[in-house]
Amino acid sequence: MSEFWVISAPGDKTPQQTYERLQKATMGSGQNLSNCYKFSIPELKVGTLDSLIGLTDDLGKLDTFCEGVCRKVASYMGEVLEDQKDKLSSNLSAGEGTLVNFMHRFQWNMAKYPTKQPIKSLTEILSKVVTQVDTDLRSKSQAYNNLKSSLQNMERKATGSLLLRNLSQIVKKDDFIDGSEYLRTVIVAVPVALFGEWEKNYESLADYVAPKSSRLLTQDEEYGLFATSIFKKVYEEFKYNCSRYKFFVREFNFNEQDSVVRQDQINKIASEKRKMLGPLLRWLKVNFSEVFTAWIHIKALRVFVESVLRYGLPVNFQAVVLDPPKKNRKRLRDVLNNLYCKLDSTGLTNVDAEDSVPGLSLGMQEYYPYVFYKVILDFESRSF
């Protein structure tokens, strides 16, 4: 798991000076609390402060929704990879590189999200991108899951318990009486623990059961399949009395073609599943990248909007990405709070999700004197 802090602080004389100040605070004097990378947000159309205030709630909801779609795509990719889930990490990328590299080198995508558009329009464009992926994921996953479920059901009947398993691949023509007007062969699944009861009672389960006709055809850990011969006219009586002893009559009429047809069906569905798997995995890889990069652009919009609302106009702030190791996070937080404590006019400095006292944070999960957003990359661990 990687945790990134996307923060912004007001520009000194220039944003570059702010960046250098942050670098010195996080990496200087031998502290090495965290790497510090520029988070490049272009100048966007500010509009009115009222419009920015109105956007904060929309962007917050979109942020949560987009992260959720990222996690759904990653989780489903792990599900599709099945016994190769250990390869999930290598399939999660952003653009041409890794998720970590994307965070370290974030650049606004001018082609997809032109900055001449108002922030509200950019928000709508990003929302449409993510919503479309979410919709497509539902339809594609449903189609693949239906095929996978059909194959699993057929394979279960071919390889599962003798109580449910398809008999066409177990019994042979010679196991059945063929062409008799009066007699028929009945296949009965008997629990292993009741074999003795079966041998003792099967001849008395109806009036016309052929003596000494019971034959064990096969067995597994739970059940044995017995064949016995009865008169056709007592079939229902025999079946009913079997159920009283917890013997299970398998409804089955032998057909030599059934086994071939069923195996052909399994092979056909397995082939369709394999053909669907490749394109589905490619779609998941491409669209995870699409949604993840959209998510970080949404973070950038949130940083920009909150920075303008906090630090005022003209726009003058520097956003950076920090990736502190867990052992350094508390120390880094203290350094940043000391560096920017003068910016706080709320009395809420140091209120965060871990340290806040219930009821005293005024409903705010995290608040710092600088703009702060967290990005946690734990898609692999959440998908297993």
UniProtKB/Swiss-Prot annotation:
Family the entry assigns: Belongs to the V-ATPase C subunit family.
Keyword vocabulary terms for this entry: Hydrogen ion transport, Ion transport, Transport
GO cellular component, one term: vacuolar proton-transporting V-type ATPase, V1 domain
Protein function: Subunit of the V1 complex of vacuolar(H+)-ATPase (V-ATPase), a multisubunit enzyme composed of a peripheral complex (V1) that hydrolyzes ATP and a membrane integral complex (V0) that translocates protons. V-ATPase is responsible for acidifying and maintaining the pH of intracellular compartments and in some cell types, is targeted to the plasma membrane, where it is responsible for acidifying the extracellular environment. Subunit C is necessary for the assembly of the catalytic sector of the enzyme and is likely to have a specific function in its catalytic activity.
InterPro entries per the UniProt record, alphabetical: ATPase_V1-cplx_csu (IPR004907), Vac_ATP_synth_c_sf (IPR036132)
Keyword Chaperone belongs to the record: no
Gene Ontology terms for molecular function: proton-transporting ATPase activity, rotational mechanism
Domain of life of the organism encoding this protein: Eukaryota
Biological classification of the source: Eukaryota, Metazoa, Chordata, Tunicata, Ascidiacea
Assembly, per entry: V-ATPase is a heteromultimeric enzyme made up of two complexes: the ATP-hydrolytic V1 complex and the proton translocation V0 complex. The V1 complex consists of three catalytic AB heterodimers that form a heterohexamer, three peripheral stalks each consisting of EG heterodimers, one central rotor including subunits D and F, and the regulatory subunits C and H. The proton translocation complex V0 consists of the proton transport subunit a, a ring of proteolipid subunits c9c'', rotary subunit d, subunits e and f, and the accessory subunits vah-19/Ac45 and vah-20/PRR.
Originating species: Ascidia sydneiensis samea
Transmembrane segments: none
Protein name: V-type proton ATPase subunit C 2
Ion transport found in the keyword field: yes
